């Protein structure tokens, strides 16, 4: 059998970018950074997070109105 075939499996610290929570696990990577963890995820906390979609919907409606106006003008 070949020696040193598998990567080293060591303890690493996982850091959450959202809440700053950190915990230890094992991995082949030197460090792990996650966007959201069990400490701040809405499913685990029971808190609803407001997602800013209103601005996107308004922008879409504005672009859609421009395209329909251009089509009506062309006909």
UniProtKB/Swiss-Prot annotation:
Disulfide cysteine pairs (residue numbers): none
Listed PROSITE patterns: RIBOSOMAL_L31
Top-level taxon of the source organism: Bacteria
One GO MF term attached to the UniProt entry: structural constituent of ribosome
Keywords, alphabetical: Ribonucleoprotein, Ribosomal protein, RNA-binding, rRNA-binding
Pfam families named in the record: Ribosomal_L31
GO BP of this protein: translation
Gene Ontology annotations for the cellular component aspect, listed alphabetically: ribonucleoprotein complex; ribosome
Coiled coil stretches, renumbered: none
Subunit structure of this chain's protein: Part of the 50S ribosomal subunit.
Function: Binds the 23S rRNA.
HAMAP family: Ribosomal_bL31_1
Family (UniProt): Belongs to the bacterial ribosomal protein bL31 family. Type A subfamily.
Protein name: Large ribosomal subunit protein bL31
Native source organism of the sequence: Chlorobium phaeobacteroides (strain DSM 266 / SMG 266 / 2430)
Gene: rpmE
